[in-house]
Each structure stands twice: as C-alpha cells, then as structure tokens.
Amino acid sequence: MEEPGATPQPYLGLVLEELGRVVAALPESMRPDENPYGFPSELVVCAAVIGFFVVLLFLWRSFRSVRSRLYVGREQKLGATLSGLIEEKCKLLEKFSLIQKEYEGYEVESSLEDASFEKAAAEEARSLEATCEKLSRSNSELEDEILCLEKDLKEEKSKHSQQDELMADISKSIQSLEDESKSLKSQIAEAKIICKTFKMSEERRAIAIKDALNENSQLQTSHKQLFQQEAEVWKGQVSELNKQKITFEDSKVHAEQVLNDKENHIKTLTGHLPMMKDQAAVLEEDTTDDDNLELKVNSQWENGANLDDPPKGALKKLIHAAKLNVSLKSLEGERNHIIIQLSEVDKTKEELTEHIKNLQTQQASLQSENIYFESENQKLQQKLKIMTEFYQENEMKLYRKLTVEENYRIEEEEKLSRVEEKISHATEELETYRKLAKDLEEELERTVHFYQKQVISYEKRGHDNWLAARTAERNLSDLRKENAHNKQKLTERELKFELLEKDPNALDVSNTAFGREHSPCSPSPLGRPSSETRAFPSPQTLLEDPLRLSPVLPGGGGRGPSSPGNPLDHQITNERGEPSYDRLIDPHRAPSDTGSLSSPVEQDRRMMFPPPGQSYPDSTLPPQREDRFYSNSERLSGPAEPRSFKMTSLDKMDRSMPSEMESSRNDAKDDLGNLNVPDSSLPAENEATGPGLIPPPLAPISGPLFPVDTRGPFMRRGPPFPPPPPGTMFGASRGYFPPRDFPGPPHAPFAMRNIYPPRGLPPYLHPRPGFYPNPTF
C-alpha cells in the first residue's frame, strides 16, 4: 500500500492555483490583508490548507495504527491457526506425495500387465480414491462440525455470560423495584395517614366553623337585642333627662326672675339701710315673730305703695327690712342650694352628654366591629369555601395519586411477576443450556476419544497394511521363484517330450535319472529357510521395538495380515494362466488330490491334452486359493513368522508370539512416516528372479471389513465401502489365461506341491473389544 503522504503531492500545484483564483475572485472587502503579521495571504491560506490536510493524514494514520494494533491479537491467533493448518497441510502433502509415488510405482508395475487387470486396478483405485475422498470429506465435515461445535460452545458460553449479566441486572432491577415498592408502600401509608389527618382536621375545622357561625349568629342576635334594649333605655333616660332639662330650664328662668327681683329689692334695701340703722335695736326685739313679720312684710310689700304714714312706715320698713334680711339670707341659702343643684344638674348633664358621646362612640365602634366581624365572617366563609374547595381538590389529587400509584403498583407487580416468570424461564433455559453444553462437551470428548482411537486403529491398519505389503512382496518373490522353478520343470518336461518323441525307448533311463533329480517327493529348494524367507519386521521395529504383530485379528492364528482385501489372499496367476500354487486341500477331499505326493504316472495323466477344438475342463483348473494367512487356530497373525515349509519351524516361531503380541498391545500409536519407508531388499529379490519375469501388480490394500455384530460388547457398523468381488479385483478369474511366453499349444496344469499349509478362511472376523466402528456420515 502506498504512503498517504505521497498522494497529495502531485495535486499541490493545482490546489495552490485554485486557491489563488479563489482569493483573486473575492471582493476587496472580503480579501484578507496583504501582509498579515508580515506574511502574504496566499502563503497563509496554503499553510492553513496544508495543515488541515496534515491533520487529516495524522488522524488517518493514528486510526490505522490503532486499528492495526487491535488486529494484532487477531492476526496472531489466525497466524497460529494458519501455521497449524499449514503444518497439517505439509504433512498431508508429504503423505500424499509418498502415496502418489507408491501409486506411480504401482501404476508402472500395473502398466506391464493386461488391460483387464488395469481396469480392475483402476476401478479399485477409483473406489479407493472415492473412499479416500469420502473419508477426507467426512474428516473435513467432522472438522467443520468440531469447529461449529466449538463456535456453538463459545456462543453458548457468551450467551451464558450474557444471561448471567442479565440475571445480575434483573436481580438488581428486582431489588431496586422492591425498594421502590417498599418506598411506595411507605409513601402510600404516609399519604393515607396524612389523608386521615386531613379528614380529621377538616371535620374539626368544620365543627369549629359551625360553632363559630352559631356563636356569631347568637352574638349578632344578642348584640342586636342588647343594642335595642340599651337604645330603648337610653331613649327613656334621654327623654327623662330632656324633661328634667325643661323643668330645670323653667326653674332656672323662674329663679333668674326671682334673683332679678331680689337684686332689685336688695338695691332698694341697700338704699334704705342707713335709715334703718337707728331702728336696729327695735328690730332685735322683734325677731321672735319672724313668720308673722314676714307675712306682714309681704302684705306690706304688696301694700307699701299705699302707706301714708312715714314714721309708721319707717318702722314698718325697718321691720320689713329685717324680715327681708332674714328672707334674703334664706334666699341666699336657697340660691346657693339651687346653684349647687344647677351645678349638679350641669355636671349630670355633662356626664350624660359624655355618656351619650361614649355610647355613640361605643355604638360607632360596635357598628364598625359589627362591620368588621361581618367582613371577617364573609372572609371566613370565603376562606371556608376556598379551603373546602382546596381540600376537595387536594383530596381528588391525592385520590388520583393513590389510584395512579395503585395502578403503578399493580403494573409493577405484574412486571415483577413477568420478570420472575422470565427469570424462571431464563434459569430453566440456563439449566438446559448448561446441560446441553455439558452434553456437547461430553460428546466432543467422546468424539475426540473416538477419533483418537480411530486414528490409532487407522495407524494400526496402516502398519498392518504395510506389513501385509512387505509380506506380499516376499510372497511375490517366493512366487517368482516358484514360477522360475515351474518354468524349469516345464523346460525339462518339454525336453522329456522331445526325447520321447525322438526316442521312445529312452523312457526308462530318463525316468530314473529325471525322477531322481526332479521327483516331487524330493525336497524343494523352497523348503529350505533362506535369508529372504525369514521374519521381516518393519524398520522401526528393527531399530527400536521388538517384532510388531498385526493387532487386527482378535484371536486368529494366521501368519499374514488379517485384511481380506489383501491382493495375495486371492488367486495369483503366472504368465501361462496357471495358478502359482496347487489347489487347496479340501478336508472332504481324498489325500491323492493334493498333488504334492502324486506319482509321475498321475502327473502324466494330468498333462493329457484335450482333443482339438475343446477347451480345458474346469476340473483341471485349480480352485480359487483361500487366504493362507487365516487360520482357525488362536495364534496371532503377523509377518514375523518364517516362511519355512516345515511345521516345526512354524511351531517354534509361534512360541514367541505372545511376547510380541503384548509389545504390540502396549504401543498405542505408530508413526505414519515409517509406513512409507522403502524396502531395500526388494530390488535384490526382483533381480534374483532374473529378467523376463513379469511380477503381478500389487493392488492397493484395503482395510479389514467389519460386519455389524450385535452380540459383541460394542455395537459395530459395517464397512464404509463394499467388499471386493471375488476373483476379479485382486486376481484373475478362472477363465482368464494370460498370454504365453513361448510358442506351442497350451499345456495342461500339472500338480505341484503347496508350500503353505491349508487353512480355512472365516466368513466374518470376530469383533475386537478395543476397536470403535467407523462413523456413518
């Protein structure tokens, strides 16, 4: 990827030109100063634009660096997984290259054979490739399933953690809701108590207001009554006082008139006083009869104008003056008394006026108080109405709040019940998911153990197949030697026939010489143990471990691998179409049919040619050879047995089998790389056979076919691919004759001694308890 700083460089000139045009296009009022702070405006704008781009680039680079740091851990994990996958791929490629090399070698060998055998080998190779592809697909599917299961486990774990978090949040929310519900309940209780107190206070206030209204009405009525009574009393008093005032005014006027008269009389008397000083003594004597004098004075006063006599009149005047003096004194006393009464009346009048004024002021104050009380009564009534309305509104609000809180409480209880149901469902789902996770983990462990055991079994099979291939190669070398021996016999018989055709009398001599040297009863050169027929373990067992045996058969005593797919377990023919071994000895056949101890006459009879135009009968052809590696005995099979033709050597080797079997059981896994080690002894054996001999091809070796056996301790499935057809895939059919390598009519098959003891082939292998079956996909 290119650097981000290199991208804006080619466009910098264009940006500067555009900026210059934009600045030139601006009006003079909007143009910046020519030299802001001593710099031209274009440089400032360019620096600002460059700084903006630099900031953007810095932010982009910082974002990329942070993103790359976040991806470091992921890349490391992916690198680790990729390294593991690459290592597995390298191993698989190495195995594939080795298998391909072997397959090319097998193809080279098979190209030397007939087209039919090539077709059979190709079909088998295709079937094996198909099975390999199926197995690889199944392996990939299993890996995908394992990855999916791991992803499911991770998802389940994440879901489990999320559900735990949700449970914690839900528990917290439940606790908060419980606290809120408790607080709401306490608030509701407080509100109920407050409502009750408000109701009680309202009732008390209503009762107090009613009492106050009743008292106010009673006070008003009593005030009116008292006011009326006082007004009536004061009206009566005022009327009486008015009457007294009138009387007092009349008495005052009369007293004033009397005073005026008396003043006038006093003035007259004062005028007559000097005249009456002389007559004082006389007047002192006449004090006794005052009343009569007064009456007389009065009468004289009335008739004073009629007095004609002056001396008598003077006496009378003196008497009258004394009487007047006494009357004046009494009048002055009365006057003083009247003045005192008048003063008292004035005082009482003033007091009454003051009392009236006080009553008027009290009346005004009472009226003002009445007005004030009426206004206060109205205000209190208005307040009462307002308070009743306010309390009603508060009561309605509180009732609404109570209804809302009750509804909210009911909703919260419903939500709590729903949340509890959800929590119960979540706990049930958690338990089910935990059980599923445990089941998945157990299934994963089982599948891992199963595939590990299956890999071990496949490795054991591969090792057994490798051992079978080694034994097959040895058998090939033995068969080539047999073919060479049979060819030698054929050449000798041809020479014998030529001698018989030339000189029939030389039969006895040639029979004695030839029979002694080449009698079938004579020991075969193949019967002697050689270095090539000895036990041939794998290179790994030669270096590290003891002789490793085939662990496939549970108790079989064969001397070869237990695979029924072994190509040498079927019929193997030579170049002349004849089998490289005699017909197997049937336990129901006669001993003379074996051909191993037959006389030369019987051999000559068997070599009779059929008439021209007829083919060989089927009875002359040997039957299909049974597997010589299986046995009904309970000895383990393995390639470590010597290929000797004496039973004593076989029994000797069988004694050492249990120790090898125990060593093979102790080894759980075999290295797959050791399965592809080439055998250095094969070229020597192939060269020993001589040129001109075409070895039969080695078909790919298939594993043992295990049928389903429900009686065993473990249920076993059938094989993942069908068994090979008899006599066609691994060997030529009975009607097949390969081309002859010498001219002349074909000869009848002659009897030959079988180098291996006859052994029966069981139709099915017994199930092995330590083996798990192949999974069905």
UniProtKB/Swiss-Prot annotation:
**Iron in keyword set:** no
Which segments cross the bilayer?
39-59
Coiled-coil intervals, chain numbering: 118-269, 339-494
**Gene3D superfamilies named in the record:** 1.20.5.340
**Which Gene Ontology terms of cellular component type are present?**
endoplasmic reticulum exit site; endoplasmic reticulum membrane
Name the family the entry cites: Belongs to the cTAGE family.
Task: List the protein's name.
Answer: cTAGE family member 9
Q: Which organism is it from?
A: Homo sapiens
